[in-house]
Amino acid sequence: MVKKGISICCMLIAIILMATPSGIAMTFAHGPTERVTKYFSYFSLMPFGYGNWFPIITALLTIVVVLLLLVGIRKANTGKAVGVCLALCIIASVLSWLIFASISIVGVCVAALHSIVLVLQVSQNSLLAK
C-alpha cells in the first residue's frame, strides 16, 4: 500500500511538472545562423502541430497511469497495465529527445519519476506473484 501511495505521489508530481511551460524545448531557426529555443508544456498542442506527438502521448498516458493506480487501490490486477503505460511513457520521452532534440531538465525529471514508479510497480508485481 505504501508503494502505491508513493507511486501516486510521483505521478502527480510528474503531471505538475508536465503542466509547467518549460517541459518541451523546441528549437526554431530564423536564419542559417540564428536559432531560438522556446519551451512549451507537455499539454500544449504546439509541439504536436510541429510533428512532435511524443509529449502529448506521454502526458495522456501519465493521466491513465494515475487513474489505474487509483483503481488499483481497490483492485490488485492493474499492475501490468500500469507497467506497460509507464514503459511507453519512458520510450516516448526518449524518442522525443532523440528525434526532435527536445530535452529539458523538466523532461528528464518527468522521465526519472516515470522510471521510479516503473521500478516500484515491477517490484510490487514480483512480490504479488510469489
What is each PLM-predicted segment?
Residues 72, 112-130:
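Membrane-water interface at the C-terminal end of transmembrane alpha helices
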Residues 17-21, 69-72, 93-96:
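Membrane-embedded alpha-helices of multi-pass membrane proteins, especially ion channels
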Residues 6-60:
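Hydrophobic transmembrane helix segments
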Residues 51-92:
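Loop-to-transmembrane helix junctions at the membrane interface
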Residues 16-19, 64-67, 116:
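Alpha-helical transmembrane segments
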Residues 27-32, 103-109, 125-130:
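A cytosolic-side transmembrane-helix exit/cap motif
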Residues 78-116:
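Hydrophobic alpha-helical transmembrane segments of integral membrane proteins
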